[in-house]
Amino acid sequence: MYYDGTGVEQSDEKAVEWYKKAAEQGDAAAQCNLGYMYKNGRGVEQSDEKAVKWVLKAADQGYADAQYHLGYMYSNGFGVEESDEKAVEWYLKAAEQGYVTAQLCLGTMYSQGTGVEESDEKAAEWFQKAAEQGDASAQCALGLMYKYGIGVEQSYEKAAKWVQKAAEQGDADAQYKLGVMYENGRGVEQSYEKAVEWYLKAAEQGLADAQCNLGAMYGNGTGVEQSYEKALEWFQKAAEQGFADAQCDLGYMYDNGTGVEQSYEKALEWYLKAAEQGLADAQYFLGEKYYNGIGVARSYEKAVAWFLKAAKQGFAYAQFRLGFMYDCGRGVEQSDAKAREWYQKAAEQGDELAIEALDWLNDK
């Protein structure tokens, strides 16, 4: 009552006083709560060590909440030497009593092989237990396991079922993933309108992936009335969070004056942000900017450098352009052999310009 001010004036100090009286008499719930007060420094001087002392007393009595929190303390090294193995041990005790957060943690640890031998099957088992109790994170994780057939037999329908349960609870990541499923018609009947609906829910929670996809839907008029202005708005939100795809898309809109006043300088700025994160599309676009001297001083050397970064990632246009640079000796020493090498890579991906260039080069 003193802890949350129910029926009395809230007081952490008095809550600690009464928790301690009960804890010293062996009450497990009070011991756990007293540990919580020490952990968070509420009504008492903060002490991870004393927190562990009291939580351990409760955990040893089989109190599931304490067992979970003790596992958490071992997992993070709070008041004890960090030990993933001991974390698993205590999570397991709580999970076997049906403690949902412990079940979720166990699923995660089995999926990553943290503190325990990796097992996708056991991960799925624990995610399933937590999911059936309504845990949104577990529902989303289980959905992804069904989507990719990890630890369970692949089923897009079951994937959609579990992801939808999490999405309906407001889980942003699940809302985004459900949007992707509706956009692609995986496990559900394809519906661009429903894809937009779910992307919007996740985007409004600030999820950059969803903001970027929503921007693309508005830009293409897919499932929603086309609006370059709204596309720009959502790309901007995601780009400002550092989402590389959105940064590139935003750069492209500035580059072409789509939904915004054209600005090669701003296009270059956003392309660069995405390119520095390793996005091949942006690296290619930057290469073109340097090659043509648009928004920046022309530099064949810098063009080659950016084309090369994208080409090494398998970006066909960049491979062709790099072959062209070697073919013409622009920004690099002329080399038929290297031109042929890069033309070949692009041609193998079906790039028609590369195929023509390769034929011409072979006929020289």
Predicted segments — roles?
Residues 1-4, 33-40, 69-76, 105-112, ...:
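Hydrophobic face of amphipathic alpha-helices that form TPR/SEL1-like repeat modules
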Residues 345-364:
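Terminal, low-structured helical/coil segments at or just beyond the last alpha-helical repeat
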Residues 16, 52-55, 88, 100, ...:
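Short hydrophobic transmembrane-like helices used for membrane targeting/insertion
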Residues 2-6, 11, 24-27, 40-42, ...:
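Short helix-capping/linker turns of helical repeat alpha-solenoids
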Residues 2-3, 19, 36, 63, ...:
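Aromatic (phenylalanine/tyrosine) cluster motif
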